[in-house]
Amino acid sequence: MAGAFALSRAVVWAAGAAAIAIAGLHENAESFDADGIARGPGAYWDSVWFLEIAREGYERAEDAAFFPLYPLLLKATGASVAGGVLVSLACFAGALWLLHRLVALDFGDDVAGLTVLLVAIFPAAVFFSAVYSESLFLLASVAALYGARTGGWALAGVAGGLATATRSAGLVLLVPLGLLWWRSTGRRLRDLAWLALVPAGLGVFCLYLELEGRDPLAPFRAQDAWGRAFAWPFGGVVDGARAAWEGARQIAAGEPRTWPVYDPAWVDLALFAVLLVTLAAVVGALRRLPLAWSLYAVAALALPLSFPADGQPLMSLPRFVSVLWPLHLWLALVVVERPAARRARAPAPSIAREIGRST
C-alpha cells in the first residue's frame, strides 16, 4: 500500500509540475490559490467551487451539487489548496490501507495489493491528490463496506453517512450494505438500524440549508444548473454513443476546432472508449466478484449514466469510475489468474506481493 501510494502520487505531482513549468498556469489560477509549481497540480476545475464553499458557504444554487463534508474539512485546514491537498492525501492513504484489508479478506494479499496498485495508477487517480472529494468518498465508502463485511454495523452506518455527506453517490451504498445485512448471520434488526445513518448524511445537509434560509431541496435540483437531467436508466450510454459518433464525424470532416482548452470531439470519443472498457469490467465483475461488490459498481454507475450532461453526456465518467474499486479488483483477478495476462503485466504480481508485505 505504501509503495503504491508514494509512487503514484510522486508521478502525479511531477507530471503536474512539469506541465506547469512548460505550459504555465491557467489564466484563472489565482482564483484557485494555485500560484506555483508546488501547489498547482493540486487544483483542477471543481477545486475552485470547493474552496469558495469552504470560504463563503453555499451562496449560489449550483453550490449544492458539492456536498458539505469535504468543504468542512477544507475550512478546518485553512480553506487553501495546500490544506485541501493534505486532506486528500491523508484520505487516499487511509482508503488504500483499508481497501487492502477489505479485498484481502476474500482474495488474499496478492490480489489486494494489485487492486490497490490499480486504483492508485488509474488515469483519473490524479484527483485523489487534488482539491476534490474523491479521496474522502473512497475512504468513507470502503470503510462502510469493510464494516459490513466484518460485522461492524456501527462503522458501516457511520461511514456510510459520511460518504453520503460527501457525495450523493453515497446513497447507493445501501445496495451492497443491505445485501450484506440480508446475508449476515441472524439478520438482527439492530444491525439494520445502523444503516439508517446512510441517508442521514443527505438529510443533515438538507436541514442545514433549511436553517440557513436556503432551499432544503437544492441538492436534488443542483444538477439542473450543471446541465444534467434524467434521461432513463443508463440512457447516458446511448447519448454517449451518439456524441462519440458526432465527434468522429467532425474529426473525419476536418471541421475547425474552436475550443481553447480541449477538443470536445476527441474528448467525447475518449469518454466513450472509457465507457466501453468500464462496461466490459462490469460484466466481468458480475461474473467473478461477490454479488455485493458487483452490484455496488452497477448501482454507482447508474447515477451518472442515467443523468447525462447536456453537450457532453459522459462528462466526468473517468472520475466517477476511479472510486469504483470492484472494477479494479476484477482486473486484478484477471492479471493474477490468467497466464497470458500475467505475462503481459509481468511486474505487477511481484509488486502486489511487495505491497501486501508492507501493509
Annotated model-derived regions:
Residues 98-101, 118-121, 136-155, 174-177, ...:
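Specific aromatic-rich, kink-prone transmembrane helix
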Residues 130-136, 317:
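Short acidic/glycine- and proline-prone juxtamembrane loop motifs at membrane-interface regions
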Residues 64, 68, 72, 78-94, ...:
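Loop-to-helix entry region of an early transmembrane alpha helix in multi-pass inner-membrane enzymes
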Residues 76, 86-106, 277-281:
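Transmembrane-helix motifs of polytopic, lipid-linked glycan transferases
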Residues 11-29, 41-43, 162, 174-277, ...:
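Membrane-lumen/periplasm interface segments of specific transmembrane helices
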Residues 99-121, 155, 290-291, 295:
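Transmembrane-helix signature of polytopic, membrane-embedded enzymes
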Residues 41-79:
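Short hydrophobic/aromatic helix or loop-helix immediately within or flanking a transmembrane segment
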Residues 93, 106, 113-124, 128-130, ...:
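Transmembrane and membrane-interface helices of multi-pass
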